[in-house]
A protein has these predicted regions:
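A short, highly charged nucleic-acid-interacting micro-segment common to nuclease
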Residues: 233-247
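Secondary-structure boundary elements
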Residues: 175-237
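Hydrophobic (often cysteine-bearing) scaffold residues that line and stabilize catalytic clefts
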Residues: 203-206, 243, 247, 251
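N-terminal accessory/pre-domain segments preceding catalytic cores
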Residues: 1-202
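Alpha-helix capping and helix-loop boundary segments enriched in small/acidic/polar residues
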Residues: 178, 238-242, 266, 271
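Generic hydrophobic secondary-structure packing signal
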Residues: 117, 206, 240, 274-275
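Conserved hydrophobic/aromatic pocket- or pore-lining residues that grip, position, or stack substrates
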Residues: 210, 214, 244, 255
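Hydrophobic/aromatic-rich core segments of domains that either
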Residues: 246-276
Length: 276
C-alpha cells in the first residue's frame, strides 16, 4: 500500500489523510494464486460468484457490472470511478501531535476489511463477466477522516470515505478498455448468428454448437501475453488465437447472452499451472 498524508484540521477536531492500495483479481487464472478467489471455495453455490457476496463487496460488484458491462460505452475514455461503501468502515484512530498514525489493531482490521471487500468484488466480477476482457485488478484510493470521539479508547474515531476505483494500470494491455465497443459489437454479431443457427435446438445441442463455433474459428496458441488469456482475440483479431482460458471465457460469454447458466472455474490439471 502507498500512503500520502494530508492533514486538514479545524481546531484540531478533525484530521484527514489519503491512502491507497492495489489488488490483483482472479480474472487471469495464473494470477489467482495472488488474489482472493479462494474466498469462493468455502461453500457450495448454485448461482453466480457475485450472488455469494453481501454488504460492501456486493455493492461494489454491482457497480462493476453496471459500469463495465451494462454502461461500458460510458467508460471508453476512462475506467476510473468514485464510490462509497454502504456499510461504513470505522476504527479507533491513533492521533499523535495532530497527525494520524497508521497503526493499531483496529486500524489494521479496518484496512483489511477494505481490501477484502474490493478483492472479493473484483474476483467475482472477473469470473462472472469475462466480457470485460481488459480487467484484471485495480488500484484504489480513499480518504481517512478522524474526529474526536469520547467512546473510542484512543480518543479519535476514523472513517474511510471518498473511495476511487482505478483499474487502468492493471489492464491486460495498455488502453485495452478502449476496444470494448468493438469487442461487444463482435459479441452481439456472433450471438445473433448462433441464435439463428440454434433455433429449435435443446440446451445440450446449443452448447455443442457454441463449442464448435469457437473451435472452428480459433487456433490454440500461446504468445506469452495476457491477451491470449482472455476472449478478446475471437472478437477483435483477424487470426484469432488463445489458450484454454480464452476458450472457456468465450464459452461463458456466449452462454450468458444465449440464456444458458454457466460458470468459469479455475484449477490445475496434472501439475500444470492454474487455468480455466
Amino acid at each position: 500500500n502507498g500512503f500520502q498524508a494530508e492533514i486538514s484540521t479545524e481546531e484540531n477536531d478533525r484530521i484527514e489523510a489519503e491512502e491507497s492500495g492495489e489488488i490483483i483479481s482472479g480474472a487471469i487464472a495464473g494470477d489467482s494464486v495472488d488474489s482472493g478467489i479462494s474466498l469462493f471455495s468455502l461453500d457450495y453455490y448454485t448461482d453466480s460468484y457475485g450472488a455469494q457476496l453481501d454488504g460492501n463487496a456486493k455493492a461494489l460488484y454491482d457497480l462493476l457490472v453496471q459500469n463495465y458491462v451494462v454502461d461500458y460505452s460510458q467508460y471508453l475514455d476512462s475506467v476510473d470511478f468514485p464510490f462509497e461503501f454502504p456499510d461504513t468502515i470505522t476504527f479507533e484512530a491513533v492521533v499523535e501531535d495532530g497527525s494520524f498514525q497508521r497503526k493499531g489493531e483496529s486500524y489494521v482490521q479496518a484496512t483489511d476489511d477494505v481490501k477484502t471487500a474490493i478483492q472479493a468484488a473484483s474476483d467475482a466480477f472477473s469470473y462472472d463477466y469475462p466480457q470485460a476482457f481488459w480487467f484484471r485488478g485495480s488500484n484504489y484510493g480513499y480518504r481517512v477522516s478522524c474526529v474526536r470521539d469520547g467512546s473510542s479508547s484512543t480518543g479519535y474515531r476514523g472513517t474511510f470515505k471518498n473511495f476511487t476505483f482505478k483499474p487502468a494500470n492493471r489492464e491486460i494491455s495498455e488502453n485495452a478498455h478502449t476496444r470494448m465497443g468493438d469487442f461487444m459489437d463482435g459479441v452481439q454479431n456472433a450471438v445473433a448468428e448462433l441464435n439463428e443457427q440454434t433455433l429449435g435446438m435443446d440446451m445440450e445441442q446449443k452448447i455443442k454448437r457454441i463449442h464448435d463455433y469457437i473451435c472452428q474459428r480459433v487456433t490454440y496458441r500461446n504468445d506469452n501475453t495476457l491477451w491470449v488469456h482472455s476472449a478478446a482475440s475471437l472478437f477483435l483479431d483477424a487470426d484469432p488465437a488463445f489458450v484454454c482460458e480464452g476458450y472457456a471465457k468465450s464459452m461463458k460469454i456466449f452462454c450468458y447472452y444465449m440464456g444458458i447458466n454457466c460458470a468459469c472455474i479455475s484449477g490445475t490439471a496434472r501439475g500444470t499451472s492454474s487455468g480455466i
